[in-house]
Structures are given as C-alpha cells and as structure tokens.
Amino acid sequence: MQAVLLVVALFGAALADPPKKIHLPTPKVKRVEKLAHQEHGVNVVQAVPITKTVVRTVNVPKTLIQEVPIHVYTDLVLKSPVPRRKVIDIKKTVLQPHIRHVPVDQPYVVHRKVPVIHTKIVRQPRPVPRIVNIPRLKVVQKQINRIIDVPRLVTRERVHRVIKPVPVVRTRVQHVDVDVPMRVVVPEPVVQDRHTQSVETVPVPHDVVRKVKVPKTFVLKDLIPVPEKAGRHYSSDK
C-alpha cells in the first residue's frame, strides 16, 4: 500500500506545474513637493496697455520638487534567534555588600500640614426676625356744609391727628440645619523607629571564584566486581 502511494506521489510531482517565480515590481521614486521659501525677488514683466511695459520685482512662490531615494535590499536573510549565555558578574552575585543597620532611639512625629475638620449637620432652633410695616393712616375730620344765617358756604377741612407708622419687629423660631464642628480623633502617622543603612564594600580581588560544594573523592584500592543483573550485560571495556 505504501509503495502504491509513493508511486502516485512521484507521478503527481512529475506532472505538476513548475513553481512560478513571483517578480515584485521595483517601487517608484517618491516625489515630495515642498513650497519654496522665497528669499529674493523675481523679475516679472507685467504689460500695461496705456503707456508702456513696466517691470516690477515681486515675490513669486515656486514649488520645489524633491526626490527622495528609496533603497531596496534584496539580500536580507531571516535569522533565527541564537541563545546567548548569561555572563555571571562576580561582583553582583558573590560579593554582596555588607549592610549594617543603625537604629535611632529618638522617634519623630510627622504632623499633618492641613488640619482635618469634621462637621455634622444638627437641626437647631434659630430666631428669625421679621419687620412688619404698619400702613400710614391719616384721619381727617371734615365739617359738613351748612346754611347759616349768613348766606355763605362753609367748607373747612382739618387734619385732626396723624398716626405715624412705626415698624414692628416680630420674631419666630425656625429650625435650620447647622454644620457643627465635631471632635474626631484622627490618627497621625508616627514613626517609632528609623534605620539608616551604611554600605561597606568588601575589598576582594576580581579573580574570586564562587565556592561550589565539591563532593569528596573516594580512591578504590581494590577492584570490587560488579554483580550482573538479569537482562543486563556489562562489557569488560567499561
């Protein structure tokens, strides 16, 4: 069965179309147009039909065409990453600095920069004054027209009294929500102890090698025959 499949695969490979080569087109040159910074004037002839041709110097903006070259690399090869061995630095691994802690007996307190104020809303009675204006009343006493012995009309108008209004202040109790400051015990950060570190570099030469636990070596004075187990054969040259 495998031979038949192999023959069929060979015939299929022989009769198949050859692989096509894909030709990638070369990228075109990129053209970048930039407006030129006109520093000097350009002579431009302008025709005036009345008198004569006048030549004036004006600034004419011209477009600057700049070609940007494109480099095509065809010999690039994709490489697989190669593992690099990590170099062990003896100074960082073996020669660790000796850190000595120096305790401080005097603790210090870190005070808050802004005091914390807590308030609570309490409903309290509050007198609210209210001014009551009294309207001005003018009492006028008039005398009715009467016919007396003397034939004349008597009309007399008198102001008997005027009540001057005095504003009266009346108060009523109103319950209002008031923010009352309350005492809240806020813990402050207190540093009880502080440690300073002094680093001392150990003066050890650079050719120091890390100590590795080497097992003890045993010297065999007499050859001890190794017993053969069932199913295993040991050669004599080992």
UniProtKB/Swiss-Prot annotation:
Keywords per UniProt: Secreted, Signal
Compartments reported by the entry: Secreted
A GO CC term attached to the entry: extracellular region
Record organism: Pinctada maxima (Silver-lipped pearl oyster)
Name of the molecule in the record: Valine-rich protein
Source domain of life: Eukaryota
Record has Secreted as a keyword: yes
Tissue specificity field: Prismatic layer of shell (at protein level). Expressed primarily in the mantle with highest level in the mantle edge and lower level in the mantle pallium.
Signal peptide stretch: 1-16
